[in-house]
Amino acid sequence: SDVYKRQRLAIHDLAVMLDVAETEVANEIADMEKEHIICGYHTLINWDNTSKDQLTAMIEVKVTPQRGQGFDRIAERIYNFPEVKAVYLMSGGYDFMVMLEGKTMKEISMFTSSKLAPLESVVSTVTHFVLKKYKDHGTVLEAKKVDERQAVTP
């Protein structure tokens, strides 16, 4: 919905869109934050348009689940590393998809080899580096370029 995509709408604008009082919108947002339905607010940055070096990696991680705790305990150990931006339990050929950001491939490689791979339950890792982002969180990151070339006809 439009509300989900445009989370920076003012309470007044949300109230108008939903045809309810502003206090009702404010109270509902506060309740959803308390209940952890709304978990945070994020700014989406296209790092390619800045002078800052930023590299995103996705790491496939195979683990051995721990008795009585399944995947939850190892997931917690992984997501508590400050470098880690996201951890997902996956179906298919591996167990977790770990997303992290760093300045260089070496920095990410060092994290994987010195912190992630040595964890007790980790069986293997495969690292993929993002070369270019075209769309992120529903937002196209590059403006369409108009082809200004003229057609040549014989």
Regions found by a protein language model. Give the residues of each.
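A compositional/biophysical signature of low hydrophobicity enriched in polar/charged and small residues
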Residues: 1-154
